[in-house]
């Protein structure tokens, strides 16, 4: 049944977190930690029920709540969670995020869907321990042809868990064909970044393609497999993609060849490559990897971002658009605005905020879990007077 076998007492005052549906409890928030590891019931100082979750003192987050009503963490529970996630993604096409961790009530689990293949990541000890319960439930609800695991992320290493990479169910091609709005990307799953494709930028890519005009010049920095660059080329614009990942640039090259499109490619680190380029470009896109994983890293990373944005603005055409994204929770929208102001001041450029976007609906943002909002994009336009 996997009903609660442990009882965890929460410190007075800290029970408000669970009552407000925040799922994580840290060591200093637990008054009476249970002996052992396993499914646990969290109660307040007076013994009133708060949540059911998984307790493991070796985890950086010892208790993660799975449900806020009494009950087991059995196959039926996980079937219900997966069925709800599937229902909420109806109409989003064949490529989307099916499970987005805590925001879908499944802490430590990410599942991306690419047609009939699922690619998953297990990021927490609790979800790893419950694998034999939730994996059959996932297969029953979604009925994929194959499931591939890419549990080789930093969050897993922080949990002290070994990496797991490979096929866990059915048949999965070595090279997965990922489709998005008529573009197809041949992704080698064993070599790809994360789960293979950055689905969270889908709506930004659509917005970008709608804004690009034939004959414009586009610079796609941190391009990965060229989701933006290929859309620019499809609209008749000149596109230059920059990335340090040779495998990703190879995928971009193959995708462009198949479509009969031209995208120029530069292999290298972003900042030195930008310094060696000449403009102008009508669109410059900066989508760096997670730059800030801990709050203490924020000042140094903001300085680095100012350098990047300054070079991007140097290359930006008059009335051109700068797209600045951050997938770091600790780098807030206010930080991005500050970075842009500092870089613009250095060059004497006047900018206006054309648009601010966030992650799409298949990467849900829970009001009660601030960390579930991670992707922010500033679309800035050069605004001379």
Swiss-Prot record:
GO cellular component, one term: cytoplasm
Transferase listed as a keyword: yes
GO biological process: methylation
EC number: 2.1.1.-
Main location class: cytoplasm
Molecular function terms, GO-annotated: methyltransferase activity; RNA binding
Record function comment: Specifically methylates the cytosine at position 1942 (m5C1942) of 23S rRNA.
Name this polypeptide is given: Ribosomal RNA large subunit methyltransferase I
Organism: Thermus thermophilus (strain ATCC 27634 / DSM 579 / HB8)
Gene name per UniProt: RlmO
